[in-house]
Amino acid sequence: MNILLVEDDLQLGKALCRALELAGFNLCWVRLIADAENKLSSGGFDLMLLDLTLPDGDGLQKLIAWRAAGQNIPIIILTARDRIESLVNSLDSGANDFLAKPFALPELISRVKAVNRRMAGFASQTWSLGALYLDPVNHQVMLDNELLMLSKKEYHLLHELMRCAGTVVRKAVLEQRLFGHGDSVESNSLEVHMHNLRRKIGKDRVITVRGIGYLLKKE
C-alpha cells in the first residue's frame, strides 16, 4: 500500500514515516500542498495522510478543491485537537477519517488499515468491468481503485449501462430510467448526462449507436 504523507512538522513526519514503514507500508513524504499536488498527478497512491495546517495553504480547503475536481484518493486528516469541531462538520467534504493530534502511532496504523479494508472490500459486492466497479447496494462507483463522484442521474445511467453491458440500451429505456413517467425532459438531457458520465469514466467506454442508443463495452 502506497501512502502519501502531507505533513510539514519534521519531527512528526519522521516518526510517521518510520512507524508506517515498519508496519509494511510504502511512504512518500512531502511538506507542502504544492508538492502533494505534483505527487498526486503522477498517480500510484492508495491513501493520503493530510495535515490541515501547512505553510502554503489550508489542507481542508485543498481537500474540498480536490474532491470538487474529482480527486478521490482516500484521505485521513491529521488535525490539532482544537480544530475537531470544525473538522467534524466538514467530513462531508470528502475526508474518509481523521485523527486529532497528538495521537498514538498504533491508532494511526489501525485507522490506515481500516480505510484500506473498506476500500478493498468495496469490490466484493460490486459489478465490474475491468477497472470500473459499481456497488448497487451503496450506490457507489470506483474506477482504478478511486471513488468517482457521480450525480444521481449519472449513477442511474451507468447502472443501466452496466446491467446491460455488451448490448445496446435504447435511448427511450435510458430516458425512462432517468426521468420516469410524466417528467418533462429537455431534448438533449440524456446527451448532457451521457457526456458528463463519459468524461468521468472515459469517453471510449460507451459507444453511441446512432438512432438507437448506447452500448457500454465489455473489457
Swiss-Prot record:
Single biological process term from Gene Ontology: regulation of DNA-templated transcription
Subcellular location: Cytoplasm
DNA-binding region: 124-218
Free-text disruption phenotype from the record: Mutation in either rssA or rssB confers a precocious-swarming phenotype on LB agar: swarming occurs at 37 degrees Celsius and is initiated at a lower cell density and more rapidly than the swarming of the parent strain at 30 degrees Celsius. Both mutants also exhibit increased hemolysin activity and altered cell surface topology.
Keyword Transcription on entry: yes
Residues covered by the Response regulatory domain: 2-116
Modified sites of kind 4-aspartylphosphate: D51
CC annotations in GO: cytosol; protein-DNA complex
InterPro entries: CheY-like_superfamily, OmpR/PhoB-type_DNA-bd, Sig_transdc_resp-reg_receiver, WalR-like, WH-like_DNA-bd_sf
Family annotation (SMART domains): REC (SM00448), Trans_reg_C (SM00862)
GO molecular function: phosphorelay response regulator activity; transcription cis-regulatory region binding
Chief localization: cytoplasm
Keyword terms of this UniProt record: Cytoplasm, DNA-binding, Phosphoprotein, Transcription, Transcription regulation, Two-component regulatory system
Name of one Pfam family that matches: Trans_reg_C
Stretches that traverse the bilayer: none
Functional description taken from the UniProt entry: Member of the two-component regulatory system RssA/RssB involved in regulation of swarming motility which has been shown to be inhibited by saturated fatty acids. RssA/RssB regulates cellular fatty acid composition, hemolysin production and cell surface topography. RssA/RssB negatively regulates the activity of SlhBA. It can also act as a negative regulator for the control of the swarming initiation. RssB binds its own promoter.
PANTHER family per the UniProt record, alphabetical: REGULATOR OF RPOS (PTHR48111), TRANSCRIPTIONAL REGULATORY PROTEIN TCTD (PTHR48111:SF67)
Protein name: Swarming motility regulation protein RssB
